[in-house]
């Protein structure tokens, strides 16, 4: 879980949006593309998900500048049915094509009950929560997941890596509420964070193997739904990866209309009931004051950050200064 920075300055939402958008335009993207990425990154900052916020602007701009990602993609719908669509991201970062895929899935779900869209040939996906939340904010249940081309192939490694750490793709379920915080499981599939490596963590594979088998299974399923189902392994991916070396990922977004299965009002009220009962019935997790389900903390931080400004940590400031100086933004 992302922790609030110990040292920070307050920055307004609008200022970050303007800055990030200016950087992306300088790096070669169209205005609408820059606006899309910036909006999603600032949303992450508002929710306190610092790892996937505007701290990434510097690296993303470098990807556009170096030719690792396509700043001016021609995003196409390759095939489509009443409830399904397949998009080609043309080597760009995942944000714009996955946002388009989410809107398509929403439109289909509202008409037919379920909508699913996959995207192939994209670079970094960002938080899966972006796309599941787009569905949720449209009054639907949202699910999103990412996969990577040739994931799991480490045949060239000098020493075989630990199986318990073999992947950590992003995955998200987003369930709308009535009045309280929604339930949003915005996570990655491995039980360990990417930085949690070493003997003290390796021993856990012996002490709690069931937890690692679960996360290994989640990783395998995520890789196939977000990668295999999206077509990242098809032959056309080789050319895209040669043209845009960072574009080795794919993604999937699923939107489910609640009405037709159950009254939307009843479902939203049941989400509220679950959140309320858990809060009243259970001891909080260590380091927290309230027994909250996933999604509640992000909701609280968004309210706080919109009132007081986003708490912008030292790492974010360092990356912002660097990209500002390089692009003169």
Which residues are covered by each model-predicted region?
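Acidic, glycine/proline-rich low-complexity segments that act as flexible tails and inter-domain linkers
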Residues: 1-13, 17-37, 42-43, 50-68, ...
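Phosphate/diphosphate-binding glycine-rich loops and adjacent basic-rich segments that engage nucleotide
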Residues: 150-206
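Conserved active-site and cofactor/substrate-binding residues in soluble primary-metabolism enzymes
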Residues: 11, 15, 19, 29-36, ...
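A generic, well-ordered mixed alpha/beta core segment in the N-terminal half of proteins
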Residues: 82-164, 172-175
């Amino acid at each position: 879980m992302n922790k609030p920075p110990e040292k920070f300055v307050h920055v307004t939402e609008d200022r970050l949006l303007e800055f990030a958008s200016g950087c992306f335009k300088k790096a070669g993207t169209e205005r609408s593309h820059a606006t899309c990425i910036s909006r999603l990154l600032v949303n992450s900052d508002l929710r306190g998900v610092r790892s996937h916020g505007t701290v990434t602007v510097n690296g993303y701009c470098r990807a556009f500048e170096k030719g690792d990602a396509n700043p001016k993609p021609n995003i196409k719908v390759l095939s489509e049915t009443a409830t399904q669509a397949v998009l080609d991201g043309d080597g760009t970062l995942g944000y714009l094509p996955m946002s388009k895929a989410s809107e398509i899935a929403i439109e289909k779900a509202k008409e037919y009950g379920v909508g699913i869209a996959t995207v192939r040939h994209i670079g970094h996906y960002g938080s899966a929560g972006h796309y599941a939340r787009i569905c949720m904010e449209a009054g639907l249940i949202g699910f999103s997941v990412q996969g990577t081309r040739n994931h799991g192939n480490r045949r060239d490694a000098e020493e075989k890596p630990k199986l318990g750490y073999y992947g950590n793709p992003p995955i998200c379920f987003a369930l709308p509420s009535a009045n309280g915080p929604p339930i949003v499981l915005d996570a990655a599939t491995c039980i360990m964070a990417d930085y949690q490596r070493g003997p003290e963590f390796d021993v856990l594979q012996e002490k709690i193997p069931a937890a690692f088998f679960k996360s290994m299974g989640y990783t395998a399923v995520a890789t196939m739904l977000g990668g295999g189902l999206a077509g990242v392994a098809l032959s056309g991916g080789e050319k895209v990866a040669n043209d845009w070396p960072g574009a080795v990922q794919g993604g999937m977004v699923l939107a489910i209309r609640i009405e037709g299965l159950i009254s939307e009002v009843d479902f939203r009220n049941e989400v509220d009931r679950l959140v309320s009962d858990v809060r009243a019935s259970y001891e909080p997790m260590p380091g927290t004051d309230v027994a909250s389900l996933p999604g509640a903390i992000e909701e609280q931080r968004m309210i706080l950050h919109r009132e007081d400004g986003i708490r912008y940590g030292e790492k974010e400031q360092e990356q912002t200064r660097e990209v500002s100086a390089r692009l003169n933004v």
